[in-house]
Structure formats: C-alpha cells, structure tokens
Amino acid sequence: MNITATVLLAFGMSMDAFAASIGKGATLHKPKFSEALRTGLIFGAVETLTPLIGWGLGMLASKFVLEWNHWVAFILLVFLGIRMIIEGVRGGNDEDDEPLRRHSFWLLVTTAIATSLDAMAVGVGLAFLQVNIIATALAIGCATLIMSTLGIMVGRFIGPLLGKRAEILGGAVLIGIGAQILWTHFHG
C-alpha cells in the first residue's frame, strides 16, 4: 500500500472518532484544549492498537487464504464502508451524543474502543496485503488523535452541520481503498 493509500486509510478510519468527538464537542459550552487533547490521545492510542490486534488475528489465518487476499481486503473494506455510510445516513446511536463533561478515563476508553472496531477489522484485511503494519497503525492513530482533538474543539460549531456526515465521508474513503486494492490486483 502506497503512502497516499495509507494516509487516506488513516483519515478514513478516524472518521468514526471524529464524528463521536463532534457530537461530544457539540455538548460542551467552551471545551478546553486540554480536554480535547486528552480525548484525542485516548482515541488515537486505541485506534493505533486495534489494527495491530486485527492484523495479528489476520496473520494467523493468512496461510489458509493467501490466494484470496485481495478479495478479503476488498470485501472487508467495502462492507465497513457501506456500514459507516448507513450509520451516517441513519444517524447512529444516542451514545455518541452524550455530553463529554469531565468524562472519566474509562468512559473515554470505552467510547474509543466502540469507534475503533472498524480499525480492527481493517487490520485483519491488511494482514493479507504487503503493508508495514506498524507505520499504518501509527498513521491511523495519529490521524485519529488529530481528528478527535479537532472534533471536540469545533464540534459545537459544526456539529449541527456535519455530524454523522463525517461517517459517510469515511465510508466512501474505505470503499475507494477497497476498489483500489481490487483494481491493482487485476491491472498490476
């Protein structure tokens, strides 16, 4: 996977956390930068670990399905992309809209895990490709840190305008990456 695809994947994977952060930021009157950064660090750390876990699980199975790797990655990315788009259109669940006010560490970790399950599934798909998983996971974590921090800070301004549309954009990016993987397989 080239650097452009890695960056697109990283920011695509950060969209769930970004959408959750916008919702949480929209509930704050004047979020402090320290609150936003704390949220970004927690979301980013979890989002770095989950693709590594998924990649490890995928590596266990890779010897059995190596000849199908492009299809596995394509199907996972398209499935996740469609799911994100559907959630964006439907509006997701009400948990994402609960106030951030002085959230405990564990509540933030739980929210981060909930928004990073897609990254774990993507990690499974990445196990079937020749990628530097450490660099990819770090890119996903950094993008999530940036987008979550930004989401908290600007959430109250753009929450009503963008909200779950961030998930739609993230889903479209995942579908595009899946299509690129399949295209590259068939057209070299």
Swiss-Prot record:
Can you say what this protein is called? Putative manganese efflux pump MntP
Main function: Probably functions as a manganese efflux pump.
- In its UniProt entry, the species of origin is given as Citrobacter koseri (strain ATCC BAA-895 / CDC 4225-83 / SGSC4696)
Q: Where in the cell is it found?
A: Cell inner membrane
Per the record, its GO cellular-component terms are: plasma membrane
- Its main localization is membrane
Q: Does the keyword Transmembrane helix apply?
A: yes
Listed GO MF terms: manganese ion transmembrane transporter activity
Disulfide connectivity for this sequence is none
Q: What topology does it adopt in the membrane?
A: Multi-pass membrane protein
| Superkingdom classification of source | Bacteria
* InterPro entries recorded: Mntp/YtaF (IPR003810), Put_MntP (IPR022929)
Q: Which residues cross the membrane?
A: 3-23, 41-61, 66-86, 107-129, 143-163, 168-188
Which keywords fit this entry according to its UniProt record? Answer: Cell inner membrane, Cell membrane, Ion transport, Manganese, Membrane, Transmembrane, Transmembrane helix, Transport
The family note in this entry says: Belongs to the MntP (TC 9.B.29) family.
Q: Which NCBIfam families match?
A: PRK11469.1
Under the heading Pfam families, the entry gives: Mntp
